[in-house]
Design a protein with these regions (language model features):
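Active-site-proximal "nucleotidyltransferase
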Residues: 135-145, 150-156
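Local cysteine-cluster metal-coordination motifs and their immediate loop/turn environment
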Residues: 149-169
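Hydrophobic, aromatic-lined core segments that form the binding pocket/scaffold
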Residues: 1-142
């Protein structure tokens, strides 16, 4: 759950900044600082606000790809290197989170932008720079809805039940 707490706290505000502001926020890891809760999970972040002059002229898709490659890939690689969690599970949960937040942002961004981002993020095997897209097929179309492709595994934790939309049902 640590990875879900960390990424779940970090991604929505970064998406909001990257997709709604004229100037792109530099999302390089050195600009992020975290404070931890007594339980060990991240309690809050603060960010050194700096413009990424290279990303400022980018499209929403390219800005999201910057979020993936600069902010998320290093975190997922570090967590996977511990040997405690599989990176594919982290990406699966991250895809689900991003898809949910795109729905929340639909009024701000417009339906066309949200659908374009969903297509690029979840249905393209590679990013525009040619790298593998770690979010590819983390959510899939089922019965007309985008849903998580694989179980998040939360049900394995003590005192935690299956999610309402668990793929194991």
């Amino acid at each position: 759950l640590w990875a879900q707490w960390y990424i779940g706290l970090m991604v929505p505000p970064l998406m909001l900044a990257l997709l709604t502001q004229e100037k792109a926020l530099d999302v390089s890891p050195e600009h992020f600082h975290a404070e931890f809760h007594e339980t060990g999970r991240v309690a809050c972040f603060w960010v050194d606000v700096c413009e990424d002059k290279n990303a400022t002229p980018h499209s929403p898709q390219q800005r999201m790809e910057t979020l993936i490659s600069q902010a998320l890939v290093p975190v997922v690689q570090a967590l996977e290197a511990t040997g405690e969690i599989n990176g594919k599970l982290i990406w699966s949960n991250t895809g689900y989170l991003i898809n949910w937040y795109l729905t929340e942002m639909k009024q701000l961004l417009g339906e066309a932008t949200v659908e374009s981002l969903r297509h690029a993020l979840f249905f393209e095997k590679t990013l525009t720079n040619g790298e593998d897209n770690p979010l590819w097929r983390t959510v899939v179309l089922r019965d007309g809805l985008l849903v998580r492709r694989t179980c998040c595994q939360r049900y394995r934790l003590p005192d935690v039940q299956q999610c309402g939309d668990c793929t194991l049902k």
